[in-house]
A protein has these predicted regions:
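Acidic/His-rich, divalent-metal-binding segments that scaffold phosphate/diphosphate chemistry
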Residues: 1-84, 124
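Short coil/turn linker and secondary-structure boundary residues
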Residues: 2, 45, 99-102, 231
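Short low-complexity stretches enriched in small and charged residues
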Residues: 8-14, 64-68, 93-98, 149-156
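A broad, low-specificity signal for short, low-complexity segments enriched in glycine/proline
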Residues: 15-17, 104, 156-162
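Divalent metal-dependent phosphate-bond-processing catalytic cores, especially two-metal-ion Mg2+/Mn2+ enzymes
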Residues: 22-30, 34-46, 59, 70, ...
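Alpha-helical scaffolds flanking conserved acidic
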Residues: 46-59, 101-110, 127-133
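Hydrophobic/aromatic-rich structural module bridging two neighboring secondary-structure elements via a short loop
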Residues: 65-106, 117
Length: 257
């Protein structure tokens, strides 16, 4: 059975049709695998390495379904680290049985690192590559979720609430300084939304930047938002402009190398 078929079979056991968030995660996983195939096609990888990267994509969010069942939320800070839960599920099941012990650990370690602020130190070169690939593929696909799905489900905050809030100084300065934003630094719902823009600064591959810029999902929510405070709207637009300038500058540097 193909890995995606096995994943869909596993996910279907949680889907009784009453919670649309199950479908959301299935679609997200399919999008991540599509992006992963684009990223691996742009690199000189062996067929086996492409397969391992694909498995990282298919199974990276497998912990989401049990998370939702137990805690009724996808928000890790209100429940459990879904990546670590997913690794437990993968270890207990037969999802990776066809792999060697070393390959299993490479895939599991990459999945365990996909939602961290930064990748853990000390990984071997191959595992580090898989971790970078799944982090990029996930972020590229998350922008679509952010733009198109119910923001209360995906971020915990509605557009109405966010439009009345401000961007905290630390979040604003992090975007201008090209830093990833720590969860504890976010003080408002708008901070949570703006923190998605900081994904740009953690993308590892030029192809990832091209995908995100072409999609345009990263700015869609903000362009549709009704801001109560014009100064806040200006701050958000500055954040968007800064991330775009950063991305295009990196791509120009890549072309020169």
């Amino acid at each position: 059975m193909d890995a995606m078929q096995k994943f869909l079979e596993y996910a279907s056991a949680y889907d009784d049709g009453s919670d649309t968030r199950i479908k959301l995660k299935i679609i997200h996983t399919q999008r991540v695998t599509e992006v992963m195939e684009q990223l691996t096609a742009a690199r000189l990888l062996s067929e086996q390495d492409k397969k391992l990267a694909y498995l990282c994509a298919v199974y990276h969010d497998i912990g989401r379904f049990e998370q939702l069942k137990r805690y009724h939320t996808f928000l890790d800070y209100k429940s459990i680290d879904h990546a670590q839960l997913g690794c437990e599920i993968l270890r207990q099941g037969d999802f990776l049985d066809e792999l060697s012990a070393r390959e299993r650990e490479q895939v599991l370690t990459a999945i365990g690192n996909h939602n961290r602020l930064t990748i853990e130190d000390g990984l071997d070169e191959k595992t580090l590559l898989f971790a970078k690939l799944i982090r990029d593929a996930d972020k590229c696909a998350i922008f679509r979720v952010f733009a198109q799905e119910n923001p209360v489900d995906t971020t915990g905050f509605s557009a109405e609430q966010v439009g009345q809030e401000a961007v905290s100084d630390v979040v604003y300065e992090s975007i201008l300084g090209h830093y990833c934003i720590k969860k504890q630094e976010r003080k408002t719902g708008l901070d949570v939304w703006v923190s998605f823009l900081s994904f740009f600064f953690d993308l590892n591959f030029a192809e990832s930047l091209r995908i995100v810029l072409k999609q345009g999902y990263y700015k869609k929510r903000f362009l549709e938002l009704n801001f109560e405070d014009p100064a806040t709207e200006e701050r958000v637009r500055r954040c968007i402009a800064e991330t775009e300038q950063y991305a295009y500058a990196r791509l120009r540097m890549e072309e020169l190398q």
